[in-house]
């Protein structure tokens, strides 16, 4: 059993990603950083004669069906349907109390053949007798644009100097480059020469190569943006010997580290119980979420 506070990672809206390295025999691979995509989780091995090897998610006794049935192998396909591949992406991490990972025969004895790949049981918070509390949790995560200085990469001038050396040694001749599947800047140059738009050895050719040498496009700035992801959660809990309840609302806003990848998620949760007698009690659990992505 895992306590949610030990699993939770700051700046991570989907708490299932925090299971990585938390339980022996459970393999968790985050194949994508995009919100809503499910991590690849293996509880009972990588293969199964029954086909699917994804574990079954159970929240407060309710089996969470996938909105889109995606196999573990297809999670890294990049298809848009993977954005709704996580069964619990709509849960507020602040509402979760614990995880219990079932790996052995107890999983199939309770949940049947669907649990052949293991079961992850999620227990949410409940009201407690004699406890009344209002709680607010806010998280702010700042992401910076990556810098080329953090990587051992050539700039445009370094790259062109390598190309020029290869050209002098005959590796980037017209016949070699023209027939290549990927030919880069020299392929574009020879295409212009072969079409008659540029003369071999002309000043125009020199200017063409010099322009490429000074280009230095910062692709990190083209693809990424500095952003602040923030989430807010308000919960109310109260209880007596007869009844108790826990209610919460939350909102998560992520402008997206990569451009055009913003996410907004809203959740609401109510867990109420009423003790009618020593032998009979009534429990109501409701949970809803809305996500725009």
Where are these regions (language model features)?
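Short, small/polar-rich motifs associated with maturation and membrane association
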Residues: 1-269, 274-291
């Amino acid at each position: 059993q895992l306590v949610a506070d030990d699993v939770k990672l700051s700046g991570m809206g989907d708490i299932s990603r925090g299971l990585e390295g938390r339980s022996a025999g459970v393999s968790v691979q985050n194949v994508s950083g995009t919100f809503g995509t499910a991590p690849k989780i293996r509880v009972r091995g990588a293969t199964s004669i029954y086909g699917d090897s994804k574990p079954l998610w159970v929240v407060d006794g309710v089996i969470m069906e996938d909105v889109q049935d995606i196999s573990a192998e297809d999670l890294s396909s990049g298809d848009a349907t993977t954005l709704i591949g996580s069964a619990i992406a709509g849960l507020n991490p602040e509402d979760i109390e614990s995880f219990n990972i079932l790996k052995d025969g107890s999983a199939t004895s309770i949940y049947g053949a669907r649990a052949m790949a293991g079961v992850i049981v999620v227990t949410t918070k409940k009201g407690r007798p004699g406890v009344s509390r209002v709680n607010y949790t806010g998280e702010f995560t700042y992401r910076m644009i990556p810098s080329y200085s953090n990587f051992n990469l050539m700039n445009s001038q370094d790259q062109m100097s390598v190309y020029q050396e290869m050209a002098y040694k005959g590796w980037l001749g017209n016949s070699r480059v023209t027939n290549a599947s990927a030919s880069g800047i020299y392929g574009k140059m020879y295409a212009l020469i072969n079409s008659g738009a540029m003369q071999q050895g002309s000043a125009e050719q020199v200017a063409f190569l010099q322009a490429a040498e000074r280009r230095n496009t910062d692709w990190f700035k083209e693809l990424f943006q500095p952003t602040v992801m923030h989430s807010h959660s308000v919960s109310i809990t109260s209880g007596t010997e007869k009844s108790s309840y826990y209610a919460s609302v939350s909102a998560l806003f992520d402008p997206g580290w990569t451009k055009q990848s913003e996410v907004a998620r809203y959740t609401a949760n109510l867990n109420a119980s009423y003790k009618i007698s020593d032998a009979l009690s009534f429990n109501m659990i409701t949970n809803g979420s809305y996500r725009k992505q």
